[in-house]
């Protein structure tokens, strides 16, 4: 497994070196990766919890993202969590039109969100009941937000606000950006990362990010803390880009 990850990381580095410089500016649709595959290990309060496999595919002006989370050990009993996001690729980045979340075989736990950009209206469906919210420009979903950072002007600095729907509610995450890069070693690869730390205004659920500066700002590490203090840490172990 270690050698497999190391080879993929090496191939990925060669591929990126041919098409992008480390100091990339705003990405255009012409330089957008056609396919990104990422695998993560997740711990809960420091203990093994799950594995995540994600696939981002962009074809001309549309994209599709699939994310599958499988629990390990006793957590496997919860079944797979599947996230799907589809939408358009614009000069400003990803513009979701539909998001779905399915947890195991329990249909009652499914969530969805429809983005009506013309009417600036977000329609979330929870347990079959629609719930509406104002749709602000740049709003993302649980699957798409991780692939939106590549469209932002580089280098990122100062602060950033991420508007994100979970399918159940619409959250705003405010971050302060640490301009000094942090190195993260994971699964035989070393990543230069940009650290997005929650601002002091975030008092409940937080999501902290370390983005790969040289690899389209793909998240290398994500630290999530819910309003009960439970910690989920997601770390990149495999990455491949076409």
Model-derived regions: residue spans:
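Cleavable N-terminal signal peptides
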Residues: 9-10, 20
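Extended hydrophobic/Leu-rich segments
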Residues: 11-13, 89
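Intrinsic low-complexity/disordered segments
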Residues: 1, 20-21, 145
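Bacterial N-terminal signal peptides that target proteins for export
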Residues: 1-9
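Hydrophobic, well-structured mid-protein blocks that either form specific transmembrane helices
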Residues: 106-150
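Acidic, serine/threonine-rich low-complexity disordered tracts
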Residues: 23-117, 154-242
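N-terminal signal peptide c-region/cleavage motif recognized by signal peptidases
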Residues: 15-19
């Amino acid at each position: 497994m270690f050698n497999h990850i190391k080879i993929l990381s090496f191939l990925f580095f060669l591929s990126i070196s041919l098409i992008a410089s480390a100091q990339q500016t705003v990405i255009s649709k012409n330089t957008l990766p056609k396919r990104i595959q990422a695998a993560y290990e997740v711990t809960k309060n420091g203990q093994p919890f799950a594995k995540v496999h994600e696939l981002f595919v962009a074809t001309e002006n549309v994209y599709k993202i699939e994310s599958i989370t499988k629990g390990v050990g006793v957590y496997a009993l919860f079944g797979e969590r599947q996230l799907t996001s589809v939408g358009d690729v614009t000069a400003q980045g990803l513009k979701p039109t539909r998001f779905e979340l399915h947890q195991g075989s329990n249909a009652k736990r499914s969530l969805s969100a429809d983005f009506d950009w013309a009417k600036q209206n977000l329609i979330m469906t929870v347990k079959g009941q629609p719930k509406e919210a104002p749709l602000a420009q740049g709003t993302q979903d649980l699957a798409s937000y991780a692939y939106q950072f590549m469209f932002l002007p580089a280098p990122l600095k100062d602060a950033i606000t991420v508007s994100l729907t979970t399918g159940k509610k619409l959250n705003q995450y405010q971050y302060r950006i640490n301009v000094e890069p942090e190195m993260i070693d994971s699964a035989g690869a070393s990543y230069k990362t940009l650290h997005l730390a929650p601002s002091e205004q975030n008092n409940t659920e937080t999501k902290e990010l370390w983005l790969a500066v040289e690899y389209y700002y793909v998240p290398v590490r994500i630290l999530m803390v819910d309003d009960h203090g439970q910690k989920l840490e997601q770390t990149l172990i495999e990455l491949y880009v076409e």
